[in-house]
From Swiss-Prot:
It is found in: Cytoplasm. One of its GO terms (molecular function) is ATP-dependent protein folding chaperone. Heterooligomeric complex of about 850 to 900 kDa that forms two stacked rings, 12 to 16 nm in diameter. This is T-complex protein 1 subunit beta. Keywords: ATP-binding, Chaperone, Cytoplasm, Nucleotide-binding. CDD domains: TCP1_beta.
Length: 527
């Protein structure tokens, strides 16, 4: 009985060589798509949404580009997933991981065409991956015992991460900001305490780091503009009185006096609620929902700063940094945890008024205010800065660093080549192929900078045959240079994640020998 008779209508399958080719082609297409964004001279892509408003994103972040694509090919989806995981785990290397996985599959395609079994290729790739990782471990730099040198390493890593982004022109300024912000976290990798606020206007150079928390709200009329030693109640509760109008209920009354009585009763109810809130011993009340005029007047009379309609992310972060909890009921003041800070005041950034909380309970809190020409510039600046913050927070925990500019790939390729010479059998072809795939990263960096990649990579290979060589590609001068002298550093954790994720993804795709596309379940099938 033919296999296709087992499947329902609309289901399809591809077997053997066709399935493998479909997987390879899809993965290589995704790799080629993001390849041009790699390196300091990588180009940006414009992503235009087909939805309402046709939103436009301008970016060169691999993960952002791939997340925005609607992909049909299953192997391509695997590469999109590894890029997302790389972004979540370490923040940088999202393009490198896809390019390396694509190159490994390109090499594997040639080996399969030479009648080498996929399992032999996988075994060779595993050996090569382990050898490459060990080569990096031998050459890591670790300055965790020297605070000054370690800070310098972090600055260099931040500048390397930012040099391929929109912030490259002011990378020193933003690297300083990112390192200062990460040091305030005191070893934590929770970036929630670092708030990024985007305000159009000015230039990227006008961006600054502020110690404390900034809430994008104005202080109401008649409210105190400055409060010292603040006790803050963060809440998510309805502060409106006119329930009858809101819920569309109807009340029949025989005189206007009765209407006045209903309104009076609602006002009394609101007075009681405000009294309970004031009874917590607070001088600042921040609410997720609207605060109507009447309760706002009551708070102003009591000398309490009332902030309404704070966005949910804003109040969650405010609760976190001030040490408070979000409350919804106010009958038991002793069970409500209040937030504390030394000073609340109104500040101006550009044309906008914002509320600044300084001296917060959580000392790690800080805000980065980004200025820029447009929302597109600010969105890309935020993504770039977030990548740098992720890499730095990971490096504070795993303090090992490496040189950059294609140096790690050449070190790994040299060791893997030596392993290939010592290995007998067909596996040695797979190990050699792994080495060629590694060299594709410095080749792409040089190509994207408009340099002669064949010449530069040949020069690099020759340089790396001397022991302890620090040579890499310097795209600014367009020549091979000493990466230590140029101050081009990368985090070991990023490189390790790129190597292991790309190898595992290519392994997974290599194992495929059949793709079965299932038909969607029809409505009657679900009954």
């Amino acid at each position: 009985m033919p296999i296709d008779k087992i499947f329902k209508d609309d289901a399809s399958e591809e077997k053997g060589e066709r399935a493998r080719m479909a997987s390879f082609v899809g993965a290589m297409a995704i790799s080629d798509l993001v390849k041009s964004t790699l390196g300091p001279k990588g180009m940006d892509k414009i992503l235009q949404s087909t939805g309402r408003g046709h939103a436009v994103t301008v970016t060169n972040d691999g993960a952002t580009i791939l997340k925005s694509l609607h992909i049909d090919n299953p192997a391509a989806k695997v590469l999109v997933d590894i890029s997302k995981v790389q972004d979540d785990e370490v923040g940088d290397g999202t393009t490198s991981v896809v390019v390396l996985a694509g190159e490994l599959l390109r090499e594997a395609e040639k080996l399969v065409a030479s009648k080498i079994h996929p399992m032999t290729i996988i075994a060779g790739y595993r050996m090569a991956s382990e050898c490459a990782r060990n080569a990096l471990l031998k050459r890591v730099i670790d300055n965790k015992d020297n605070a000054e040198k370690f800070r310098s390493d972090l600055l260099k890593i931040a500048m390397t991460t930012l040099c391929s982004k929109i912030l490259s022109q002011d990378k020193e300024h933003f690297a300083e900001m990112a390192v200062d912000a990460v040091f305030r976290l005191k070893g934590s990798t929770n970036l929630e305490a670092i708030q990024i606020i985007k305000k159009p206007g000015g230039s990227l150079k006008d961006s600054f780091l502020d110690e404390g928390f900034i809430l994008d709200k104005k202080i109401g009329i008649g409210q105190p503009k400055r409060i010292e030693n603040a006790n803050i109640l963060v809440a998510n509760t309805a502060m409106d009185t006119d329930k009858v109008k809101i819920y569309g209920a109807r009340v029949r009354v025989d005189s206007m006096t009765k209407v006045a009585e209903i309104e009076g009763a609602e006002k009394e109810k609101m007075k009681d609620k405000v009294k309970k809130i004031i009874g917590h011993g607070i001088n600042c009340f921040v609410n997720r929902q609207l605060i109507y005029n009447f309760p706002e007047e009551l708070f102003a009379d009591a000398g309490i700063l009332a902030i309404e309609h704070a966005d949910f992310e804003g109040i969650e972060r405010l609760g976190l940094v001030t040490g408070g909890e979000i409350a919804s009921t106010f009958d038991n003041p002793e069970s409500v945890k209040l937030g504390h800070c030394k000073l609340i005041e109104e500040i101006m950034i550009g044309e906008d008024k914002l509320i600044h909380f300084s001296g917060c309970e959580m000392g790690q809190a800080c805000s980065i205010v980004l200025r820029g020409a447009s929302h597109h510039v600010l969105d890309e600046a935020e993504r770039s800065l977030h990548d740098a913050l992720c890499v730095l927070s990971q490096t504070v925990n795993d303090t090992r660093v490496l040189l950059g500019g294609g140096w790690p790939e050449m070190v790994m390729a040299k060791e893997v080549d030596e392993l290939a010479r010592k290995t007998a059998g067909k596996k040695s072809h797979a190990i050699e192929a792994f080495s060629r795939a590694l060299v594709a990263i410095p080749t792409t960096i040089a190509d994207n900078a408009g340099l002669d990649s064949a010449e530069l990579v040949a020069q690099l290979r020759a340089e790396h045959h001397t022991e302890g060589c620090n040579a890499g590609i310097d795209v600014i001068t367009g020549a091979v240079g000493d990466m230590e002298e140029r101050g081009i550093y990368e985090a070991f954790k990023v490189k390790q994640a790129v190597l292991l994720s790309a190898t595992e993804a290519s392994e997974m795709i290599l194992r495929v020998d059949e793709i079965i596309t299932c038909a969607p379940r029809r409505r009657e099938d679900r009954m």
